[in-house]
Amino acid sequence: MTWGENRIDLFAVDEKGMAAHKYWDGSNWQPEGDKTENLGGDFVGEMAATSWGPGRLDIVGCTREGKYMHKYFNKDSWSKWEDFGGQFASPPSMVSWGPNRLDIFGIDVNGTLLHQYWNGESYLPEWENLGGPVSCFAAFDFRNVQG
């Protein structure tokens, strides 16, 4: 996942359930060595991450209680964790197809594929039901990047 040239961001859940972050700055991994940036939380499974532009990162993780939690980085600092709620049985997936747009997907405990999005001003009032039951899914975004 990247927000620009020569930048790679990695997110993981450590053995204590906290979100961990490490990034490539074009010449070195930061923080250096085996250290990571601790972003807190109490997660299980994989994190989802995306970027809608330079200096912007969004991550979502699933807590032990099955809630999705969201955090973003905007140029120089991380937000607090935002509770998206839910009773999810899958890790989240997230894509962004443009500035100020996030689409988050997950499977709830009933096997229903759910969708939530940010349109630059607000989220949907409730998770959108995309059908089911399903056991797995993949989300993909495409942006025509011209250089």
Residue map of PLM features:
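A structural motif
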Residues: M1-G147
